[in-house]
């Protein structure tokens, strides 16, 4: 356990990793953090400031001023000519922070200036460090070395100690990290860990401690995945942790403001970790190969059409979801942050479109719930104002569906179990055909999509195919109801309402299915009352639907008329 944690600490970067972890650890073991890392402001050498016992002075209460560095400290880190090097930063603390920035209520406390690093001080500069400490130590100012070993001990004795984490959870945690190269096994053990942590979680500090255990365990798992060059389990676990963290925050109505604020910060950390690992997986790892013909289909390393199809839809869905997160965050941001998020959104859309163009399997959804990934791609295109660029994708899907339904060849089914999918189709008999197509959300989604992009001729052909070949199919949509908010994030159970569509026979001149869908949205408003939607976190609901394989509610189906944004350029086209 110590080795796992020590390697994790050693790998942490200074910004957005070590400087995020340290305040969490200090808060957990009883320190009062009075200064957090800032961006764009003068720090005067101090990354984190906290009041608490000095472990090197028999627990005497002191003001700790932390200077944070990643990895090992060598000669170039000590005084290599940059203002942010260790020695200039220590001088800045002495001459600026201490005389000018310490709050009055802490001014009489002894001061511990702590050089905090993920690794250790190398021998080549050890003498410089000792000389500096001896020269500048006074009765009220002393210097401390907080190396990776101390941080690992702090994690193990605090957040991940045996009493707090428990034997079963520690075993689940260790297995999830050890099996990171076996994604399904690693994910299963991490889910066991997270289930144990949030079960009957308290509203007080003990509950917040459990959340900190969750996020630190996740950080370590992600670090192990990066080290092993396998991001599958870390990505899935980040999604799961984000959903669970939101559920805990959403249930914290009885918590004090201090605890609620701490839990909101933890949620932000998990979201940042998801965005980071998503960028590594989608933009950095998949992106460079997305525009190469069959490259990612070949990367699946399977001759099975099913394996390739499932893997490519998974990749497209992840790209679309990551893009939607950056879209919603970007719209709320300003200046450079806004530009950065919207640029990443455009990258994600371009990657998803390239996947479609270069991997024809994406025009052949084998599962009915692949409407989730298709719907998210369309929603992302709408956000960018580029729906017209991906309409060809929808038309190609429907054209192929017409053929597959009539010839009863590799048609999409509502089955989700891999073994059933691997056997599908068992035969072409009427009995099996009806059994495997008895319900569908994909079909009404595609009908509405064709109507909204005004592909009227293709829509007419598709409706005729469905009427003649699938008269027994129940076409339906799923909408949340009161109480869905209690179950969807953690359990992912379908606590909603299934509505058969069309609600009445659509004859020539009657109301369109798209109009009926608009009426359903108008009449079933529970989605708009869901906690995440009310707080502007629509991508969180999309993530829950995709992660737990719940149908995409019609409230979140794309609208062509709402997609045009004059300030946005059209995206890349998805052609056949």
Predicted regions and their residues:
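Mixed-charge (Asp/Glu-Lys/Arg
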Residues: 1-576
